[in-house]
Amino acid sequence: MKTLKTLFTLCCVALCFANPVSATTYPLTLKNCGYTMTFTQPPQRAVALGQNTAEIMLLLGLEDKLAATAFWPTHVLPELAGQNARVKLLTVEIPTLESILATNPDFVAAQLPLLLGPDSKVAKREDFTSLGVNSYLSPGMCATKKDTGDIYGSRGQLWDMSLLYEEIADMAAIFDVQARGEALIENFKQREAALRKKFAGASGNPSFLFWFSSASPSSDAYVGGKNSASGFIANVLGGHNAITSATEWPTVSWESIIAANPDVIVVASLDRNRWALDKADEKVKFLKSDPAVSQLEAVKKGHIYVMDGQAMNPTIRTLRGAEQVAAQLEKSGLN
């Protein structure tokens, strides 16, 4: 929490000391996920689809430029609650195209291909282009390959923070708040470096399982793939992902998880109530009570840790999630 407050403070400082030399020159042309956009001025009625997109904009101090947000798996960061309260919420779930258009947007940015793209349940980018509205998709999701039959695709190499920095820099340029963007990026870089230094001597290259959720106790586990943000967290903490699938969000049987025998199990904390095992305490209860799963060494040794579920997505919360797990590892003497 302290690091997030520091991050927010840095952005506030950037408001006071913004360098006019770095101001955006309009028209601004940007390329994003194969699309070229031109902005003649900063958007005034943006719609953020996805929690990460919304929180990036709020951290950049853009609440007055936001017409609405949608799709929130967890509550907003506490230090952003006041700003967020000033922005219309369409829904915490998947919005309709009609509800988005009703806000009269002049820019639509999305976190996930589920919310914007050729296979989206909401809209294709062409739906907005035809109306003269620019759209944007998180670069972290553009980097996945759509070859798995899953909307999130697969990732050929380990995700890293550079893709998040690209997104922050793009948003800062679009809205002409570059100094704030630079402050955010520098804060993240310092925090990642500190974690890597702390866990550089981690012994044994421990394997991590990142369990997001399951529809029911009898269902397979929905987990972070090898090269996903979860894999990045494992890497930062001196280990590796126990899941070898390159799919971004594979569903894996418990038989396969038992065979992988992870050293550490990280369970997602979610505020939504979509699936039976969304809540962290329900996941922990399952791990400890299932006859087979409870025999995993990680379970018997108590190496089960809770992390913000949004951190398992490639978001501004990913590093925060790494910090959460790091604190629990240190408390257990596993760093």
Annotate each PLM feature.
Residues 52-56, 72-75, 107-108, 113-118, ...:
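Solvent-exposed loop/turn segments at secondary-structure junctions
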Residues 155-167, 266-335:
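Structured C-terminal subdomain patch of bacterial secreted/periplasmic proteins
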Residues 2-6, 18-55, 157, 170-211, ...:
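Bacterial Sec-exported substrate-binding components of ABC uptake systems
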